[in-house]
Amino acid sequence: MRFYDRKDEIEILQENERQAHDSAVFTVLTGRRRVGKTSLVTHALEGAEWAYLFVSKDSEAALCQKFQRELEEQVGIHVYGQVTNFRDLFKVIMEESTRRHFTIVIDEFQNLHKINPAIFSEIQDLWDRYHNISRLNLIVSGSIM
């Protein structure tokens, strides 16, 4: 796929990926629906180790179960036992990122709030605790209504 007038955005995403090898990076990508946000990220992360997590309108427990499978398949993060809430799953991600670098893309991030209204503050708390020792490149993407 060719991207027109997106060179700067691709370079920023690629630079963030490089920087995250040394310290955690958190990127927020927003835009109208169907403008190519996911395609842009996919192109920018070509060759990187990354996982794509889509926030569907499922229960928190069902999404956590789906995300556990995707994390194991895409970046080799094995979660022992069954995690049923986002906070615990995000903690596993942050702990793993202290040992090695990888990227997590969470698409339709705004939908997490509908499933668990406390999730944004819980993610902020864990990010604040771990980001100084983490090598996670976290990209959250969402649509502007």
Tell me what each language-model feature is:
Residues 1-145:
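Phosphate-binding site recognition
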